[in-house]
């Protein structure tokens, strides 16, 4: 994305608000497909899920009141979609972009844990088990203040796909 991840847009921008609404819709649509077991998603579902994740990233990059966490989370969602589709190279590309957004904006806590989780899953998909395990350990080691957020991260760290690691 060419949008500076450090930029936050003000409220009251009608076009930005429309992008925000579309970002939410596309994000939620992506999760509807991600929530289905692999055996229940068709090839058409996978394609729609992927397009929805890219649409979410596009709209979040232009949304009113966006912050760097929106960039990181959009990249995380793309990394997860590509991991679920078993394309480790694209998953790692987006996981690295997620991590870069976190580092550039000094995001920590929940977002940093998920950047490590995305890298771990992508590396596992690529068969790079040692690196994947190190990243999964890093994800589990990130301090997360909110107990509910911590529980969500911990749950995702044990949820498949982990590609045999």
Predicted regions located by residue number:
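TPR repeat positional signature
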Residues: 19, 26-33, 52-53, 75, ...
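Residue signature of alpha-solenoid helical repeat architecture, marking inter-repeat boundaries
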Residues: 17-24, 47, 67-69, 110
């Amino acid at each position: 994305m060419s949008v500076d991840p450090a930029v936050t847009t003000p409220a009251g921008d009608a076009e930005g608000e429309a992008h925000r609404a579309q970002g939410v819709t596309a994000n939620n649509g992506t999760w509807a497909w991600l929530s289905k077991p692999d055996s229940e998603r068709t090839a058409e579902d996978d394609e729609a899920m992927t397009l929805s994740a890219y649409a979410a990233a596009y709209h979040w990059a232009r949304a009113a009141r966006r912050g760097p966490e929106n960039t990181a989370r959009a990249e995380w969602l793309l990394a997860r979609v590509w991991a679920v589709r078993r394309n480790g190279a694209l998953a790692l590309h987006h996981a690295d972009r997620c991590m870069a957004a976190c580092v550039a904006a000094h995001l920590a806590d929940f977002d940093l844990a998920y950047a490590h989780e995305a890298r771990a899953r992508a590396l596992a998909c690529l068969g790079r088990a040692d690196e994947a395990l190190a990243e999964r350990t890093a994800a589990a080691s990130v301090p997360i203040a909110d107990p509910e957020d911590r529980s969500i991260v911990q749950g995702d760290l044990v949820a498949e796909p982990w590609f045999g690691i």
